[in-house]
Amino acid sequence: MSTLGFIEYDKASPEVRAVYDDIMATRKIDKVTNFWKALAHDPVRLKRTWEDTKEIMSPGALDALTKELIYVAVSVSNQCDYCIAAHSAAARKKGMTTAMFNELLSVVGLTNANNRLVAGHQVEIDDQFKAVG
């Protein structure tokens, strides 16, 4: 159970309902997911988080599937079970295959392991990498 519980649509303030309505319309869903219902205890944060999510997760220089794969990778590293489940489902809808998911997990595992090795050895950055920014 969420720390503060969930605010369901029928119990939501008009301000929260407006955000819920936008989420449902944008995502073409008929029910707001638990993440948003948990954030609704702070309507300002709910609105800001939704606006940021809507903008950043929209296709841009990176396509929608790539953004979902990045979201899954970061969520795996952060051990956010909810985010892994939600964004793996979204990535599958956008074309992620089982092979892609398994390869993503391999990259996440390799990156985490190598990051720890670099940190432990306190490896200085090569000049050739400093210019890349």
What are the residue ranges of the model-derived segments?
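Hydrophobic alpha-helical segments
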Residues: M1-G133
